[in-house]
Amino acid sequence: MRSSVLFSLYAATLVAAVAHPKDPQIVLQESQATIVEPDEYLIELSPGETRWVTEDDKWALRRENINFFDITHNKELGTLNHKLSTESVKFPSKPAHNESIVPLLKELKKENMRTHLETFTSFHTRYYKSHYGAESSAWLLEQVRKTLTDAGASKASVKAFPHPWGQASIIATIPGKSDKTVVIGAHQDSINLFLPSILAAPGADDDGSGTVTILEALRVLLKSEEVLKGEADNTIEFHWYSAEEGGLLGSQAIFQSYEKEGRDVKAMLQQDMTGYVQKTLDAGEPESVGVITDFVHPGLTEFIKKIITVYCDIPYVLTKCGYACSDHASASKAGYPSAFVIESDFKYSDNKIHTTEDKIEYLSFDHMLQHARLTLGLVYELAFAKFK
């Protein structure tokens, strides 16, 4: 019964698309109309395990909480750095910049995150193939640009990293004294896995929360005169990836380009879903930061645990999320040390994601503030770390 109703709805929508090409529900841009999508996509479900699937198959897998790389156009990722050993990257034994970081932590404002997230979730969807996704990306780019301008960050820059599907990724760069680079990431797109091109996807938690969390961390990081003047030992980048929900497409494109360019990325942290704590509290568990332990760099992950202990007001919990579960996996595949933190033990994470109900009202900005503290503490410590 449900399938027949959905088919009727889908058919009616297609008719409406033909009859009313300017209807706001029709999410493909005119400029994208000539893009020819393949009938099937090549996905990687685990190392070496690939499968050809349709787009509907992709969404069906995601509804079953099965993650993957879409490698249809990214088969070269990891082929150049496959012999690169991330074990050679050594992280500090403990945080060493407490005196500089603690005053900065006091500058983080959850009100800023709320204000940004209210606008970011007001787009009907941020689906990467939609004009809404392109518009939300343009809005976010402007917020990042304004953040740099307001800080007087004349040495810093921000650019759109274009993709053929229309929604650009965003990269903000704060040059340091070397090309060794520390990356902080989140994904900007959202999706409704039932009918991505039609249904609303506010994406407050997934990953609007991570998007505004790292934006606020960037704002406060730029209050450091040393960072602002380019005196950090290492270059800092903040990334907002497009099309994570489609199979880590945006981050794959970026890290494939970095791999080809020989970029020296020393660390990458992904902040994906930073705001939901209710299931944790309902289970009688303490509010905590979920530190992912599978398919991540152990040294970087160990250092992140120390950062949480020193700079956050809540503990961490160790948890797992599986293969290709967020954009850090693209960095890892390219041969770069990567890590991932999430709002809780994975079993208590937000089950409203990928639906119309992924709304601000279910989130805790106090919890997001803890993720911002983690982000700020980590990026500052690693910006001044003495990597070989």
From Swiss-Prot:
Main localization (coarse): secreted
Sequence positions that bind Zn(2+) 1: 187, 206, 272
Top-tier EC class: hydrolase
Propiece span(s): 20-88
GO biological process, one term: proteolysis
EC number in record: 3.4.11.-
One GO molecular-function entry: metalloexopeptidase activity
Matching Pfam families: Peptidase_M28 (PF04389)
Signal sequence annotation: 1-19
Subcellular location: Secreted
InterPro entries tied to this protein: M28_fam (IPR045175), Peptidase_M28 (IPR007484)
Homology family: Belongs to the peptidase M28 family. M28E subfamily.
Annotated protein name in UniProt: Leucine aminopeptidase 1
Gene: LAP1
